[in-house]
Amino acid sequence: MLYIQYNAQKNNKTKTSRVYKPFPKIKKAMNLGRVIFYGSIRAFNQNAYRRLREHFISLEKEYVISGLSEEVIIYKDNRGIPHIEASNLNDVYKAQGFITTKDRLWQMDMSRRLVNGRLSEILGPDLINNDKLFRSFSLFRSAQKSICLYSEETLEWMQSYCDGVNTYIEHAKKLNRLPVEFTILDYEPEPWSILDMLSIGRLLSYSLSHNFTNEIFRFELQKKIDDELFEEIKPNYPSDGPITIPDYMMGENVKIQQQTSEKTINNLDFFSDHLAELLNLSSEVTKGSNGWVISGKHTKSGKPILANDPHIEMQAPSTWYQTHLKVNNETENMNVIGVTLPGVCGIILGHNDKIAWGVTNNRADVQDLFIEKRNPSNPNQFQYKGKWEEAEVIEEVIKVKGQADVAFPVVVTRHGPIISDVIGNNQQIKLKENLALQWNANYPTCDLEALLDINRSKNWEEFRNSLRKYSTPVLNFLFASEDGTIAYRVGGKIPIRNKGNGLLPVPGCDDEFEWKGFIPFEELPEVVNPKQGFIVSANNKVIGDHYPYMIASSWDAPYRAKRINQMLRKSIAENTPLVIEDVKIMQDDTLNLQAVQLLNILLPVLYPVKHNKLETECIRILQKWDCKDTSYNAAPLIYHFWWWEICCTLFKEKMGTFLFEKMVDRMNITDELIRKAAQGNDSTWFNNAGGFEKVIIESFKKSIITIIDLQGNNPYEWKWGEFHHFITKHPFGKKNKFIGNLINPQGKIPIGGSYVTVALASYDRKTGHILDGAPWRMVVDLKDCLGMDINAPGQSGNFLSHWYDDQSLLYVNQQLETQKFKPEQYRNSKMKVKLKPSKSM
């Protein structure tokens, strides 16, 4: 039974307050007014804002909570990071749930509603198609099937976290302290459950896996262009691109599995001409990451250093929530710090007092689209091996704010749910064909148990064994330990296909393209203590072509991985022992290796041509450029606009605007075409656009005209950061500019980097807004587990809090803060909260 008592301590007396709850409409208006009033104060008078905000930010120092066995103390440091000290794991997870909810409740609820397909319930009919899509994905159903795989002990910990969440929700309801977003949208949060926790954990799988849209892109493109053009733009990883585990590390050569796609393409001639509309879900922005680990033989401390900066959407509040969990008793011991997803217990990425770990997106192809043949006499039957099989039909009802409920059937074949009717841009796309999505995220898994085991692992063997339980999303795990071990391992379930390479949709009426299992755990790529003394992973190709299984057909452009390797090899060659500050500087590196390579090809094409004065000045700026994508420089602006114009000139007319915007592997393909054309190799794409020289010259001239429209006609006043910028955007601010300016007063902040630099910052090509980056960065020296990190824009989801965006400027200025891992670093905090067990237990 839920029990909570609130003690307001004033003059050492306990005071019970009567809570006033206004009528809903009045309360909604009051809170909207609060947003405007305090947002205005924040925008114009920061000091007054800081004083007044305390009226609406809870400052309780003590709570009495049922279910705790001992007192728990939470210390909040100067960045609002909770350091939770408890006597057992159940108590520490309950406290984690409580304090996380205090900071991120509305974000947690929105994540839950997204994955469960329940956004229309509070946001109205515009989100119906989005809800249909996620109901079809059925991630919450696979999460539900996963619960039985978890141990009783882990389920108990997870329930403790949920109890902590629900305790705070009830407390906030009683004192009318729910986040203001709930009042404005006129609803209250429901209790949190283990199913909610596991469901939103699968949002990472969704965020990191979009191969099914890539399959549709390739097939639609293959129908629009001839075979010669199509062959030129098949996925291709550069021959000089770095590989995380090259052949020389494997110590052996094995025969690679042969997979072709010719029959697949020939069997798809009946496919609909309207499939391009399915790509509305896709995005140019792809989620990546940087990670590397350095042996102690190359560090000043003599212990390994690990660096990690996962790339994900830049949003407010941050995707990540920083937390420190400390438990110390005779039977249970844990001291772990890092980040997690709000609503999920434990630490997903970080370090304890013995090991550190990080991840990057593996890019494994874990999704396939199957073209299912429906029985014309029975719409719930599909052909398989000459017979009609009954599909599972789940009748869904979507509640919609302001209108009647919407009934919606989810049809699930042997390969997965039919998704072809619901993929679109806020509209239902009806197709003759039936596409079923097979995805490793639709299988029952116990990923969170693996991560909770990692939190308490003390060495490589324990860490590796924990990964046996891990399935999705497929990640590259980087590891370092106090004993000097450094390692890399692929974690997750990667399918083994009977046939095909995952590039295109395949017929589902027989077993020709079936999955026949997953790559065995012992055969997943792994390297421990390599002779070179470091390991780098930056979404580049994972392993050489002698590996017997197909992991993926396409990888990120190799520039980030190549640059990290370059910096590490230089330090080692100079015999310079690395310290944590050196590695932080590497994370902040803005050298554009793409420009280093391509300008040697592109600039000479311009020299024989007559240019106007402004164009000539732009060429001089590029000639003098050090190829660093710094925010204050004009050269990055000229270069990136020029490169983009080359892409547009090559592909847009032939592909059409829609397909061009959804183009897969655009960077690798474009750069390879430029390199080959410069070497004299014939390119049909360049020939169709007027020839290599014409494309390069005209693209340059067009890009200069575009920049003039943006920043005037003096190139020496142009700045990359005037276009390329970071901005903290609360979801409410995206819809209403006035409210957005009040909630996010810092406005646009110039930032360096780009989509090819180690300091990654991919952006909207129309607005320059940063879309994808590394909101959380970490560097850890295993000597005394000294860690530094940053989490932009901040810890709190409350836009009235100082911690809402206090890390934004640190992030833009490429600064990290020292983690307060030792008790003496955080126990003197003035922000101390005690959670006391109820006497009525």
Regions inferred by a protein language model and the residue ranges of each:
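Stable alpha-helical elements in mature extracytoplasmic
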Residues: 115, 139, 143, 154-157, ...
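Hydrophobic alpha-helical segments
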Residues: 420, 424, 433, 470-574, ...
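Glycine- and hydrophobic-rich flexible loops that cap the catalytic core of alpha/beta enzyme folds
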Residues: 270, 284-286, 290, 325-346, ...
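Substrate-recognition/specificity elements adjacent to catalytic centers across diverse enzyme folds
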Residues: 2-7, 11-305, 310-313, 328, ...
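Gly/Pro-rich active-site capping loops and adjacent beta-alpha segments
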Residues: 82, 91-133, 139, 358-409, ...
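Charged, long alpha-helical assembly modules
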Residues: 639-723
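Terminal end segments
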Residues: 29, 37-40, 44, 550-616, ...
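Second-shell loop/turn segments in exported
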Residues: 92-95, 143-155, 438, 448-454, ...
